Amino acid sequence: MPPKRKRGATVLKAASSKAKSIKASGGDEDGDEDNAADDDTTHAGVGGPKKKKMKMKNDEQQNQQQPTTNDETTTKTERTCTPPPPPKTCPYLSFVNRPLLDFDFEKRCSVSFAKENCYCCLTCGHFFAGRGPKTPAYTHALERENHFVFMHLENGRAFCLPDNYEIFDASLEDVRKVLFPRFTSEEITRLEKEAIWSKALDGTEYLVGVVGLNRVENAKGVNSIVQSLARVEKLRAHFLSASLIRSDGNNNNNKNENDTLQSLCQRIWNKHNFRGHTSPDSFVRKLRKQIKLAHPEKLETDIDNLFNDPFATLRHFLTFVVPKKYVDELFRGELLMLNQKNKTQPFVFVPLKLPDAPLFRDVMEKNAIPQVALAELLKPFALKTAPEYLILAFVNRFSKNQFTKEVSKNPTIVTFPVKNLKIQASSAAGSNSNSNPFSYDLLANVDSAGKATVKHVDGNWYETNDLFVNEVLAQQVTLGETYVQIYKRVASP
């Protein structure tokens, strides 16, 4: 057998032969140690140093590609977390259902009953509060299909929920014109001179300024008095000018209070309405609340009787609703009582008493209906200061029996002129001088049934009975049992 070779001797022999070759090539021992270390590191023999340089170069390139600061890392993270921009046009505007939109009622959330920050769903017309997560509006948008477009009831801004981005689209302007009735000075002047017809969503035409009013909570007297006061030109101009569209763009569009006489008058004269009628619901609710706060002892039946009676409603309006400035400027005058030793008395309306109804029947066994001329009822009075608008009230048209508590109606018919009502001036009272009397033309007449017959700017007469509006002849105005009248002073012919 051949002898076994020792591994250590072989390694020493190889190292000595390698040292001899390095000396022959002019190297040194340090360089040889470095090369040997490279060999052990790379396990590749002679090509080690070249591959190490390539590896270092690759490491430098990788370090250059990586971000070097924390700010750059944060910016990159923010860019990836930023939500996408909202679309230029909302894809859900086709689901806006205008026939279901009704802004006449109290603006209160239908879920939480909150008044603040309320939105209207333009698909179903219901009111909801909030816009953020877990709010009634946000929940409604998630639960109902295609109910995504909402409009703020105070400023008219539209949003798409639950994505929560604002919608800027001109197609919603007609909705804002119903939510916020606005008028230019030219439109107000035009409304005072000519009749304007408009078309509702259902295709029916209605006359702007003579629209039906929905009767709410036994308030028939409210409807008739509102229709009558809407004929007073200066008062109407004051209400419409409050929502004037200014040329400088500084419009008061931030508040939308639909529980005032001003807002109700604006809706009556708005030519952009979706319907040919409107509702005084929120206005009547506010009146009831004010009365309950001022007179807690009053019962609901007492308030019902107040708003069912046109004359009682008129007194309440002139005292608490119509601005005092316009009451004094338009309706206040001074009356000379000729049958009380020429006593002078200021007035807002002239109270007139009808003759009592006869107690006995005529020869035909029928109750005779008495008649009296308005001129006869005005004989005991003379105007010392003539107001621009004269209100006449037949205060004993209804009377209450003190024993039975029953209300009876006086059926006396009053004959009156539609034009050129003459009322004597105080200078002619008790003297033989022939001074010119004051002349008045009729604007509105309210009968005992609560129907208001009003004169429009085109000279035609219209009978309004809650939601129903019919054109009538001037001769038909004097046929009913008149209760309250409004006249306008004109130049004597």
Indicate where each model-derived feature is located.
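UBL (ubiquitin/ubiquitin-like) substrate-recognition surfaces
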Residues: P2-P493
